[in-house]
Amino acid sequence: MSAQKPGLHPRNRHHSRYDLATLCQVNPELKQFLTLTPAGEQSVDFANPLAVKALNKALLAHFYAVANWDIPDGFLCPPVPGRADYIHHLADLLAEASGTIPARASILDIGVGANCIYPLIGVHEYGWRFTGSETSSQALSSAQAIISANPGLNRAIRLRRQKESGAIFNGIIHKNEQYDATLCNPPFHDSAAAARAGSERKRRNLGLNKDDALNFGGQQQELWCEGGEVTFIKKMIEESKGFAKQVMWFTSLVSRGENLPPLYRALTDVGAVKVVKKEMAQGQKQSRFIAWTFMNDEQRRRFVNRQR
């Protein structure tokens, strides 16, 4: 069980294949979802959303000390290794100002989701403090239930409802607050029809019928928005200018490389001082996030060393 997963960040805890025997001890309900691959190796039935949820429960308990985790049916069940990669690469970005990863960084997660995945990983790995924003009251309730069910998380993670339709930072970042970074996994598709087509494609690839519920399901606000991710991130870029002195790094995942040029143009238009692209790879899946700041090197050094 020592095969490497190519491309993961060096500090990612998921380089080796899953130790399913250990994970089944951590969460016994995972055992019923184990299958054999054509090569005769044990694996998890990734087409079954209950299996993926059981795997996530085991991973979060075993690696991140999250003993109690659950999400309502129909919400995204995120792949933990890929989410951890974003956190580790973000840590490297925050370290460039002072040479060390800040231990008390304050992070804003835009669209924290029912799963609360980024704060859970970031709190455990780096001791960061998180604010999570969310438009869905059901997702917010789920995330709060996870926080309340695990000792210590209430002190590290706070949640805020985004009540203003179409707003991202406005109404969430308060007047005197400062954040070392923001992160976001934006809605990917540009319509409900496109989101359904994407799910259909994945169903076919897994050889399932259309009635099967899947771990790549998700609520409307998780999967699509008008104009897709380019429009969403452009809106984020536009709003970020108003918080240029309160946030050191704004970041967002970008699912498709071809979406980068219009985003770079938007960043030039708002006067971003520095723009960084971080490439990531999880197995065959390529992804990346972009980061931008309105602070120069000296301003970022002072920001990191500010009184907290």
From Swiss-Prot:
Specifically methylates the adenine in position 1618 of 23S rRNA. GO terms for molecular function: 23S rRNA (adenine(1618)-N(6))-methyltransferase activity. Keywords: Cytoplasm, Methyltransferase, rRNA processing, S-adenosyl-L-methionine, Transferase. Belongs to the methyltransferase superfamily. METTL16/RlmF family. It is an enzyme of class 2 (transferase). It is found in: Cytoplasm. The keyword Methyltransferase applies. Its EC number is 2.1.1.181. GO terms for biological process: rRNA base methylation. Its main location: cytoplasm. Signal peptide: none annotated. It catalyses: adenosine(1618) in 23S rRNA + S-adenosyl-L-methionine = N(6)-methyladenosine(1618) in 23S rRNA + S-adenosyl-L-homocysteine + H(+). It comes from the Bacteria. This is Ribosomal RNA large subunit methyltransferase F.
